[in-house]
């Protein structure tokens, strides 16, 4: 359960908070509301393995719930595919792919899938609860994110994506919502829902591009096959948004945003905000090159550039150490 005073998660059996020592409410006296159909169906699907606590939010594909793992007494997040989408073969396939893709990737900066299952039209995946929120939260709260903080986070994510790329998996939906943080501030990439092997066909039978238009590479917006450099482009957009508070392209609909991704050049972030250094802007703009060959060849190359940038900034030893540890956490073979 979560402490009502400081928000720290505590074991279900705890009487007082491990951080602030405040008395914790007894479970039977905790406020409750009549469970909706999704919660009822989820409880039926998961049985006694998880204790569903509350709904955290809802996205285009799934509802997200906070729960306790009954045996391990640790918080988890359960994503439940919307019931109407569970009847859609294409969406079911996408949701299934997320679980399978994440299960194949074991890396300290990739959010693992702990469990998955289906009971009738209730389809769910279970992941660890990450208490640090998302990069999207940080941008919304502060309008922009400190350049070194953003560089550290994206360096960690880039190393994780390089690991995925070397196993033939491209994420294809990088955005601030999918960059989460653990309690120590380490960045974790999640939501491999439209990840696919580099040389497989597109997921959609209609051939439409899958992803979020504001973060799509030009080749992805055109529905072409993509490789890891497409994710590098998306990381550049995430860095851009962290630096100035908004992505480089916007429009009234997905088509207009996709058109700009393909045909228009972004304004350099240091032109928009003079507080953005030329060095940091140059890293971002290289990621945003229209031609994949002009970008960083590998996500690890982007990580190295970001680490060099952090190293050039005085007094940021902790951020440098975190990025360097991530870079060398998994041995990486040379590019073939």
Give the residues covered by each predicted segment.
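Activation segment signature within eukaryotic-like protein kinase domains
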Residues: 153-154
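AlphaC helix of the eukaryotic protein kinase fold
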Residues: 82-104
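C-terminal lobe helix-coil module of Hanks-type protein kinase domains
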Residues: 68, 161, 180, 212-318
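Juxtacatalytic C-terminal regulatory tail of Ser/Thr protein kinases
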Residues: 25-38, 293, 297-336
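Protein kinase catalytic-loop region centered on the HRD/HxD motif
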Residues: 159-169
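Conserved short submotifs of the Hanks-type protein kinase catalytic core
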Residues: 120-134, 138
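Protein kinase glycine-rich loop
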Residues: 53-59, 64
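Activation-segment/catalytic-loop signature of the eukaryotic protein kinase fold
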Residues: 116
């Amino acid at each position: 359960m979560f402490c009502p005073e400081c928000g720290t998660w505590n074991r279900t059996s705890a009487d007082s908070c491990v951080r602030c020592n405040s008395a914790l409410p007894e479970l039977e006296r905790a406020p409750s509301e009549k469970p909706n159909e999704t919660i009822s169906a989820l409880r039926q699907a998961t049985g006694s393995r998880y204790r569903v606590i509350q709904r955290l939010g809802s996205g285009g594909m799934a509802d997200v719930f906070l729960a306790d793992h009954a045996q391990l007494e640790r918080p988890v997040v359960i994503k439940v595919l919307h019931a109407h989408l569970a009847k859609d073969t294409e969406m079911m396939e996408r949701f299934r792919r997320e679980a399978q893709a994440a299960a194949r990737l074991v890396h300290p900066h990739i959010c693992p899938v702990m469990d998955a299952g289906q009971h009738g039209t209730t389809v769910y995946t279970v992941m660890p609860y990450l208490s640090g929120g998302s990069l999207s939260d940080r941008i919304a709260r502060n309008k922009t994110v400190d350049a070194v903080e953003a560089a550290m986070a994206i360096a960690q994510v880039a190393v994780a994506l390089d690991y995925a790329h070397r196993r033939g998996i491209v994420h294809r939906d990088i955005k601030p919502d999918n960059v989460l943080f653990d309690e120590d501030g380490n960045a974790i990439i999640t939501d491999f829902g439209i990840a696919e092997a580099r040389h497989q066909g597109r997921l959609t039978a209609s051939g439409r591009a899958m992803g979020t238009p504001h973060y799509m590479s030009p080749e992805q917006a055109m529905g072409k096959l993509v490789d890891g450099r497409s994710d590098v482009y998306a990381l550049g957009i995430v860095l851009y948004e962290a630096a100035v508070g908004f992505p480089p392209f916007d429009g009234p609909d997905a088509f207009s945003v996709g058109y700009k991704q393909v045909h228009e050049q972004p304004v350099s972030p240091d032109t928009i905000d003079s507080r953005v250094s030329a060095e940091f802007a140059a890293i971002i703009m290289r990621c945003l090159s229209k031609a994949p060959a002009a970008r960083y060849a590998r996500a690890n190359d982007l990580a190295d550039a970001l680490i060099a940038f952090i190293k050039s900034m005085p007094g940021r030893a902790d951020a440098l150490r975190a990025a360097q540890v991530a870079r060398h956490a998994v041995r990486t073979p040379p590019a073939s």
